[in-house]
Amino acid sequence: MARIAGVDLPRDKRIEVSLTYIFGIGRSSSRKILTDAGINPDTRVKDLTEEEVSKLREIIEKEYHVEGDLRRQVNMDIKRLMDLGCYRGIRHRRGLPVRGQNTKTNARTRKGPKRTAGGKKK
């Protein structure tokens, strides 16, 4: 089983699809990596040689932010917005949608389950 960037790639899938299991690599970047490495995208992971795996590992480490580094970067960017106190940061802090979506009826994913206010007494 090939291990790249701390992720075990599934053996029976095509290498083009397997690379997308790494956080930060999608289909298009996967194709670009394989082109740079000179590997056929239809090759299965189990059929890769150790040379090809090391070449992939080298390209990914050199040119891409993936896994832990990328997650840390994203979290730091969100924290920076919150510290600045800008509109987007405030929306993140309150757990509301950040990109201008309506919140009157929808946005349940972001807001969480409904919290009903206490009943009104006479």
UniProtKB/Swiss-Prot annotation:
Cellular compartments per GO CC: cytosol; small ribosomal subunit
Record keywords, A-Z: Ribonucleoprotein, Ribosomal protein, RNA-binding, rRNA-binding, tRNA-binding
Keyword GTP-binding attached: no
One BP term from GO: translation
Region (Disordered): 93-122
Bias (Basic residues): 107-122
Molecular function as annotated in GO: rRNA binding; structural constituent of ribosome; tRNA binding
tRNA-binding keyword on record: yes
SUPFAM superfamilies in the cross-refs: S13-like H2TH domain
Pfam family, one: Ribosomal_S13
HAMAP family hit by this protein: Ribosomal_uS13
Entry's family note: Belongs to the universal ribosomal protein uS13 family.
NCBIfam families named among the record's database cross-references: uS13_bact
PANTHER family found in the cross-reference section: 30S RIBOSOMAL PROTEIN S13/40S RIBOSOMAL PROTEIN S18, SMALL RIBOSOMAL SUBUNIT PROTEIN US13M
Entry function: Located at the top of the head of the 30S subunit, it contacts several helices of the 16S rRNA. In the 70S ribosome it contacts the 23S rRNA (bridge B1a) and protein L5 of the 50S subunit (bridge B1b), connecting the 2 subunits; these bridges are implicated in subunit movement. Contacts the tRNAs in the A and P-sites.
Quaternary structure and interacting proteins, as annotated: Part of the 30S ribosomal subunit. Forms a loose heterodimer with protein S19. Forms two bridges to the 50S subunit in the 70S ribosome.
Protein name in the entry: Small ribosomal subunit protein uS13
Organism of derivation: Syntrophomonas wolfei subsp. wolfei (strain DSM 2245B / Goettingen)
